[in-house]
UniProtKB/Swiss-Prot annotation:
<dbReference type="InterPro" id="IPR020565">
    <property type="entry name" value="ImidazoleglycerP_deHydtase_CS"/>
</dbReference>
<keyword id="KW-0368">Histidine biosynthesis</keyword>
<dbReference type="InterPro" id="IPR020568">
    <property type="entry name" value="Ribosomal_Su5_D2-typ_SF"/>
</dbReference>
<keyword id="KW-0963">Cytoplasm</keyword>
<dbReference type="GO" id="GO:0004424">
    <property type="term" value="F:imidazoleglycerol-phosphate dehydratase activity"/>
</dbReference>
<dbReference type="GO" id="GO:0005737">
    <property type="term" value="C:cytoplasm"/>
</dbReference>
<dbReference type="Pfam" id="PF00475">
    <property type="entry name" value="IGPD"/>
</dbReference>
<keyword id="KW-0028">Amino-acid biosynthesis</keyword>
<comment type="pathway">
    <text>Amino-acid biosynthesis; L-histidine biosynthesis; L-histidine from 5-phospho-alpha-D-ribose 1-diphosphate: step 6/9.</text>
</comment>
<dbReference type="InterPro" id="IPR000807">
    <property type="entry name" value="ImidazoleglycerolP_deHydtase"/>
</dbReference>
<protein>
    <recommendedName>
        <fullName>Imidazoleglycerol-phosphate dehydratase</fullName>
        <ecNumber>4.2.1.19</ecNumber>
    </recommendedName>
</protein>
<comment type="similarity">
    <text>Belongs to the imidazoleglycerol-phosphate dehydratase family.</text>
</comment>
<dbReference type="InterPro" id="IPR038494">
    <property type="entry name" value="IGPD_sf"/>
</dbReference>
<dbReference type="GO" id="GO:0000105">
    <property type="term" value="P:L-histidine biosynthetic process"/>
</dbReference>
<keyword id="KW-0456">Lyase</keyword>
Length: 195
């Protein structure tokens, strides 16, 4: 089983992430940021990743540190669970619609952090959640998972729908990329022989 548990403790946050890449999509999420929990649940359900995240952060200031550090810790756990990446498909992609909204996510588990994030939300907040924090979440994930990630919201009017299509597509792209391919066996999917 490809599993990992990582804890990150700073003066701003205390976060523990446990995940199983070969799970069934169950989640237990308690970040203290309800809309973030809702989006993390999309990753679990659509990625078939069992995800347990507990976070305590300086929410009396705002959600920035909690959201960013959750992305960082999730990225660290993801990298640890993938280990040497032998036999994985490596690349994943997904288009996901939700009513009027449509997003595309493409990922390469390359070992090289890179983020292209092209999302123009139709409003700055979803409830009391600042949508700018999603960029911080994905930047934290990418830098600590060592992946290249392209996120494009192609259209959308409802900001909630825009965010949800992004996270659903992210989960589905992850699911595709981490799948093992029996034809690869123990081969690393790179001409360099390592990722």
């Amino acid at each position: 089983m490809r599993t990992a548990q990582v804890s990150r403790n700073t003066l701003e946050t205390e976060i523990t992430v446990s995940l199983n890449l070969d799970g069934s999509g169950t989640s237990r999420l308690a970040t203290g940021v309800p809309f973030l929990d809702h989006m993390l649940d999309q990753i679990a359900r659509h990625g078939l990743i069992d995800l347990d995240i507990a976070a305590k952060g300086d929410l009396h200031i705002d959600a920035h540190h909690t959201v960013e550090d959750t992305g960082i810790t999730l990225g660290q756990a993801f990298a640890k669970a993938l280990a040497d990446k032998k036999g994985i498909r490596r690349y994943g992609h997904a288009y996901v619609p939700l009513d009027e909204a449509l997003s595309r996510v493409v990922i390469d588990l390359s070992g090289r952090p890179g983020l292209e994030y092209h999302v123009d939300y139709t409003r700055a907040r979803i409830g009391d959640f600042d949508v700018d924090l999603f960029l911080e979440f994905f930047r934290g994930f990418v830098n600590h998972a060592g992946v290249t990630l392209h996120i494009d919201n192609l259209r959308g009017i409802n900001a909630h729908h825009q965010a949800e299509t992004i996270f659903k597509a992210f989960g589905r792209a992850l699911r595709m990329a981490v799948e093992t391919d029996a034809r690869l066996g123990d081969v690393t999917p790179s001409t360099k022989g390592a990722l």
